[in-house]
């Protein structure tokens, strides 16, 4: 199956349950950047990313629209700490801002539990979540 080059993408991001509520409160999600273990690989489709789905171990899923499609910021560990987060595994992070005032109900519930890949951030088409 070939990818639709026009389709909006969703960043699927596993977060610890203790961190998920703070991310939703702040409208911020982040992933490790650089050469640290678990850092995200920016691949084709990233520029079409319009949503973020936060989950914990493939469950407790929350879908939100990004404030700026396909864009992200690079923050230091210290900048995240100044926003109330406690990052532990890298010096730099990819940060995305989302509209935390309007959670989006999604009609499809794809399998997010995929062994070790459950915990890796990935980009998936919006059609995996909405009809």
Predicted segments with their positions:
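Compositionally biased, charged N-terminal/linker segments
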Residues: 1-49, 54-58, 103-131
């Amino acid at each position: 199956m070939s990818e639709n080059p026009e389709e909006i993408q969703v960043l699927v991001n596993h977060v610890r349950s203790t961190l998920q509520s703070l991310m939703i409160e702040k409208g911020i999600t982040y992933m490790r950047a650089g050469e640290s273990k678990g850092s995200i690989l920016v691949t084709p489709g990233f520029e079409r990313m319009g949503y973020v789905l936060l989950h914990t171990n493939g469950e407790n899923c929350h879908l939100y629209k990004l404030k700026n499609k396909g864009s992200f910021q690079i923050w230091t560990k210290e900048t995240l700490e100044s926003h109330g987060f406690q990052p532990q595994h890298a010096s730099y992070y990819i940060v995305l801002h989302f509209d935390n005032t309007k959670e989006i109900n999604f009609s499809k519930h794809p399998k997010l539990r995929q062994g070790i890949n459950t915990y890796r951030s990935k980009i998936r088409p919006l059609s995996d979540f909405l009809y």
